[in-house]
């Protein structure tokens, strides 16, 4: 993340707070509340954060990463890390990748 311009920075707070709430309440079986309508904007923000993280990693690849690493590997690596790292969620991410 270092050196990246996060286009979705305003969503960061709304994305992190539910994760803390979720970790506290998951053991009580109320995680289903996350899917309630009032949390929809959190899910959208988290999706945007992950998309920007993927775009950032693709940009970093051009500067720092080994030349032989394929785009698909970069995307897979980012996709494995970002959903749980940023939101603790695993719902599908729809991203427009840079050309």
UniProtKB/Swiss-Prot annotation:
- Nucleus in keyword set: no
A Gene Ontology BP annotation from the UniProt entry: defense response to bacterium
Q: Which InterPro entries match?
A: Bifun_inhib/LTP/seed_sf (IPR036312)
Q: Which UniProt keywords apply?
A: Antibiotic, Antimicrobial
Q: How does it assemble?
A: Heterodimer.
Known role:
Has antibacterial activity against Gram-negative Klebsiella sp. but not against E.coli, Proteus sp., Salmonella sp. and Xanthomonas sp. or against Gram-positive bacteria S.pyogenes, S.aureus and Rathayibacter sp. Has no antifungal activity.
What is stated as this protein's family in its record?
Belongs to the 2S seed storage albumins family.
Q: What is this protein called?
A: Antimicrobial protein 2
